[in-house]
């Protein structure tokens, strides 16, 4: 443990805000603490200092990160601020502290809306998320929010006078559609979870479609789960639109399939099921040819 007396403190001053103090010896910040004046020991130098409300400290912490990684916060003298803004926007991975703060504040607002029980709040959260995705502001926080919206009412049921008040299939459907814009392994896991737990064919269809757009099929996990879903709904609630989307997803994932026999069997079950429309069964015969040839 470092000697507390040897630890030096520096202050970062941002116009219009109170100074933020951090340890110059270990160059670290202590964990965020609840609101109020709380004495927090430095994680490395064991020196205590006072921290204010976390909402105020968030802006300062972003400023520290920006200076540490060389992100421009204020334009240099003799330069045009608009030029710096254009360069920052064009670099892709660079953003100003103000932009980072707005993204953080946006995430807080969306999280509160997602946690709300009301339907209207969740609709508004989806609108905010869609605007963020269209603006190129995708993040892990948005992915987590969409995952929560996609499972709203599935694993936590709230009842009032015996009536379920948090079952929102339209919210789950739209969340599954938006998850396709954030392709990752976490997105794939969230969609598979929705697909296995939801009873609404429309929501399951949206999850299946998004899985095809994400395109991740490690060890045939995605196609195997889709095959199980196909057999499940074929037995309890055969739906032509769901079967058609399953076929389309099989076609998209054909290049990633290892065990083609299992996929072909699932497709042929749809083709041989007389409860589906002729167009769906004809589509199954088209897809099976592509799967056999490896999606070529």
UniProtKB/Swiss-Prot annotation:
Which keywords does the record carry? Answer: Membrane, Transmembrane, Transmembrane helix
Identify the GO cellular component terms for this protein: membrane
Name a Pfam family for this protein: HEAT_2
Q: Which residue windows are transmembrane per the record?
A: 59-76
Its primary localisation, in coarse terms, equals: membrane
Intrachain S-S bonds: none
Bilayer topology annotation: Single-pass membrane protein
Keyword Signal attributed: no
Residue ranges annotated as coiled coil are none
Subcellular location, record wording: Membrane
Q: Which InterPro entries match?
A: ARM-like, ARM-type_fold
According to UniProt, the name of this protein is: Uncharacterized protein TP_0608
| Species | Treponema pallidum (strain Nichols)
């Amino acid at each position: 443990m470092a000697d507390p007396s040897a630890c030096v403190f520096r202050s970062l001053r941002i116009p219009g805000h109170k100074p933020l103090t951090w340890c110059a010896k270990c160059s670290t910040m202590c964990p965020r603490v609840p609101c109020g004046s709380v004495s927090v020991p430095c994680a490395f130098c064991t020196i205590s200092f006072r921290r204010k409300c976390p909402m105020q400290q968030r802006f300062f912490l972003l400023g520290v990160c920006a200076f540490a990684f060389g992100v421009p916060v204020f334009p240099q003298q003799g330069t045009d601020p608009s030029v710096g803004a254009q360069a920052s926007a064009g670099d892709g991975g660079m953003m100003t502290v103000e932009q980072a703060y707005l993204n953080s504040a946006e995430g807080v607002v969306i999280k509160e809306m997602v946690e709300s029980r009301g339907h209207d709040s969740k609709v508004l959260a989806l609108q905010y998320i869609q605007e963020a995705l269209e603006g190129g502001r995708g993040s892990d926080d948005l992915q987590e929010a969409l995952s929560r919206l996609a499972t709203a009412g599935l694993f936590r049921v709230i009842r009032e006078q015996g009536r379920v008040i948090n079952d929102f299939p339209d919210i789950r459907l739209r969340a599954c559609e938006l998850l396709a814009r954030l392709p990752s392994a976490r997105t794939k896991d969230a969609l598979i979870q929705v697909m296995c737990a939801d009873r609404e064919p429309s929501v399951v269809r949206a999850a299946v479609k998004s899985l095809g757009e994400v395109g991740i099929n490690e060890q045939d996990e995605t196609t195997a789960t889709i095959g199980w879903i196909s057999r499940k709904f074929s037995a309890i609630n055969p739906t032509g639109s769901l079967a058609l989307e399953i076929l389309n997803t099989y076609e998209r994932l054909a290049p990633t399939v290892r065990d083609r026999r299992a996929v072909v069997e699932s497709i042929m079950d749809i083709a041989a099921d007389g409860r589906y429309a002729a167009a769906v069964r004809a589509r199954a015969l088209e897809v099976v040819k592509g799967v056999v040839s490896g999606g070529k």
